[in-house]
Amino acid sequence: LGARGLGGEVPKTWQLGFAPGPGQLVRHLSAKGFKPDEMVQANVALSNDGGKLRDRFFNRVMFPIGDAQGECIAFGGRVIGTGEPKYLNTGETPLFHKSEVLYGLDKAKAAMASTGVALIVEGYTDVIALHEAGFTNAVATLGTALTRQHIRILSHHAKSKIIYLFDGDAAGQRAADRALEFIDSSMTPE
């Protein structure tokens, strides 16, 4: 974690974790008495056609994804080293709809309200780095899919500006182009 700029108090502040090698979580939860269907429903395990369970997340730094009040509703994991996908989120659930959640909103909403400004980035580590640098009004879209619901949420907390800070790669440029589609008559792009 330290090599990725996530050392010191960061893991504690952001409740970061680690998902070890494959099969360890399923074995641990089974030993604690959890049933296979409970693990699948909780979105921490997947079941193959033969009914064999496997960990949804392994060999990943884990980021709890909270709602606006900070209650954990999902997880995101970034692979350690090489591997695909680089980032993996919990699947959609009755509580978690990726298009309606902004990572770090619980920690950023007060700063958004006091400054009137929201900074929006693509990923977990971007949010954490900005908060550590003093930009506590930053949130992430959990990838590049900015939605109208995200804009509504941001507009509720940040009354003056929404500043997009997407990555400079092709995916980031596409995200910025899509974000411009959501600008309405009450917003002025800068």
Predicted regions: what is each one?
Residues 2-12:
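Non-catalytic interaction/clamp surfaces of large macromolecular machines
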Residues 11-13, 18-19:
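Terminal amphipathic helices with adjacent charged low-complexity linkers/tails
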Residues 15, 144-145, 168-169:
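Conserved beta-strand edge residues that scaffold enzyme active sites
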Residues 162, 167-190:
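Phosphate/diphosphate-binding loops
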